[in-house]
Structures are given as C-alpha cells and as structure tokens.
Amino acid sequence: MPTFATPKPITVSIELSVGDVRIVASDRTDTIVQVRPTDDSREVDVRDAEQTRVEQTPDGLVVKTPRPRGLGLLGKPGSVDVTIELPAGSSVHGDSSVAAFHTSGRLGECKIKTTAGNVDLDETGPLDLHTGAGAVSVTKAGGDTEVTTGTGRIRLGEIDGAAVIKNSNGDTRIDAVTGNLRMNASNGDLIVGRADANVTGKSANGEIRIGQVSSGTVEVKTSNGEIEIGVGAGSAARLDLFTSFGHVRNHMDAADSPEPTDSVVEVSARTSYGDIVIRRA
C-alpha cells in the first residue's frame, strides 16, 4: 500500500482500463494508494493489479493500469479497484474505458472521462465530466461545470458557476445554479430547482421545469412535453409563449411596465405537444 508525503493538495492522474475508483479527500498530509484485483481468484485481475504503476510526480501522483490484452471474443480484460486517500482540495484527472468513479470529501478541479461507468462525486471545484453510458451524481461543484452522458440519469446539486449539461438519453435534474446554464437532451426531462442567471434548455422529448428564476433570460423548447417556469417574488416577467397542441396557463398578475429598479425575467417558451405554465415561485 504505497504512502506518499503530501503536505498540500495535489493533482492525481488516473488511467484505468476496467475497474472501480474510490477517492476519499480529508484534512491530511499524506496520500495512500491501494490497488486491488476486482476478483482475486482471476489471474488476469491479479496480474493487472500487480502491474499497475503508482508514481509520485512534482505535482502529485500518477496511477496507471496496464492496457488490456484481450477484449470481446479475444478474452475478458483484467479489472482492478483503486482507492486513494488524499488531502482535501486535491485535483483529480481520470480517464478510463469501463470504470465507475466515486468520491467523498472536498476536491479541487476534476476532469473525468469514461466510456462506460457511473460517476458519483461529492464536492468538487470546476468540473469537466464525460461518460458515454452511465449515471452521474454530483453533490456540489464549486466552479464552471460541463457534464455529458450518452445515456443515463444526471443529478446535480449546487453549481456555483456556469454550466453546460448534455444528456442524449435520460433525465437531468439540477438543484441550483448561480451562473448561466445551457442544457440539451435528446430524450429526457430537464428539471432545475433554482437558476440565478440565464437559462437555455432544449429537449426533443421531455418536460422542462424551472422552479425559480428571478432575473435574466430563459429560452426553453421541447418538441414533446410540458413546460413550467416559476418567476421569483418581486420580479417582473416578459413572456413569449407558444404551444402547437396544448394550453398556455399564465398565473402571473397582469401589470404595467416594470419599474427601472425591478428585476425582469424574459421568458421564451416553445413546445409542440404540451402545456406551458407560468407561475409565481
């Protein structure tokens, strides 16, 4: 079990073919790396764990598993499980073919890419996350965020920054975002609890719901699904709403032009099949 002196946050680079990655960030001055075969009864798993390279660099650590020797009909590749305990605030760069990533504690910048595998993160700094197939869960991202999945649910808590979210097949839910938000889905709902800046959202098939927005511009469009937007108390709204097959329900009180000091939300909402609901948050 390699142990390294790391008195300050580091950068960990992980290259993993197949397996599982767990990272625990806490108030500590060292880093511990544990590499185990996923199944210690499989020779290929044991071999890959033994051949995994763990090296300290000037900026942090590199963890790299060997390349698979067989795929598909040629044989099942080896699988290893990596556990890293490191200082809070450390950055993580992960690249894998088939692997799940799990973190707990506060991390810094995170860049994670996996062809297939779920990603479950606790608290990060700026985040760049891409998975070809897998569910994504993030408790809090402290910086600009980009998340993409080919198929799978996306569940994001607080985003303190701008965000770009792309989901080809699956629902997307965000609790709160402070910066500009851009969302795209081919098949799935787009749900936002609170947006503090501009929002652009488009789904080919799915509902779009924004619980509260108090300023900025909202442009949302879906080909098939209901749209619901809550306008924050004390904010005026300029509305441009259209549905081809459905009803428009505006529960806002009619008013004259807003005062110069009022917050104004400009809403453009389009759906081909579905109702549009505008209400007070």
Question: Each PLM stretch: what is its role?
Answer:
Residues M1-A281:
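Intrinsically disordered, low-complexity terminal regions
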